[in-house]
């Protein structure tokens, strides 16, 4: 950027481009550093979880899974109830479609059976 004697400020397009790129590059570097830090934390958490699982597998007493089995059974019951409701709904829709098809068939037949109006002769 340079200034002239008349108090005007002229902007060199190259300086403007470099300034914009440098800002973008700085933001990108910050995002990369933040990603690297989060990856390190994730790695640390994975190691902690693996250690916990190793400790858990060394226990002589089995893990109590009864609460989880109960929750799974409750979920299964809910899924089955939903499935039954959907089946009932599908059955009602099928009946409705059949009734509509019957009514449509009857209407078409009644229209076909009607005599066409006599057209005047020329």
From Swiss-Prot:
Pfam families: Snapin_Pallidin. GO terms for cellular component: BLOC complex; BLOC-1 complex; secretory granule; synaptic vesicle. GO terms for molecular function: SNARE binding. GO terms for biological process: endosomal transport; endosome to lysosome transport; intracellular protein transport; lysosome localization; lysosome organization; positive regulation of gut granule assembly; positive regulation of intracellular protein transport; synaptic vesicle exocytosis. The keyword Coiled coil applies. Residues 76-109 form a coiled coil. Keywords: Coiled coil. The keyword Metal-binding does not apply. It comes from the Eukaryota. Belongs to the SNAPIN family. Component of the biogenesis of lysosome-related organelles complex-1 (BLOC-1) composed at least of blos-1, blos-2, blos-4, dsbn-1, glo-2, mutd-1 and snpn-1. Interacts with dsbn-1. Component of the biogenesis of lysosome-related organelles complex-1 (BLOC-1) involved in gut granule biogenesis. This is SNAPIN protein homolog. It comes from Caenorhabditis elegans. The gene is snpn-1.
């Amino acid at each position: 950027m340079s200034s002239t004697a008349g108090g005007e400020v002229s902007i060199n397009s190259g300086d403007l481009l470099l300034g914009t790129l440098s800002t973008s590059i700085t933001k990108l570097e910050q995002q990369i550093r933040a990603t690297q830090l989060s990856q390190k934390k994730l790695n640390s958490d994975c190691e902690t979880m693996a250690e916990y699982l190793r400790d858990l597998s060394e226990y002589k007493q089995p893990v109590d899974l009864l609460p989880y089995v109960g929750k799974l059974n409750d979920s299964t019951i809910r899924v089955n109830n939903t499935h039954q409701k959907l089946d009932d709904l599908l059955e009602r829709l099928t009946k409705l479609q059949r009734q509509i098809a019957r009514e449509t068939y009857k209407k078409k037949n009644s229209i076909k059976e009607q005599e066409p109006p006599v057209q005047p002769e020329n």
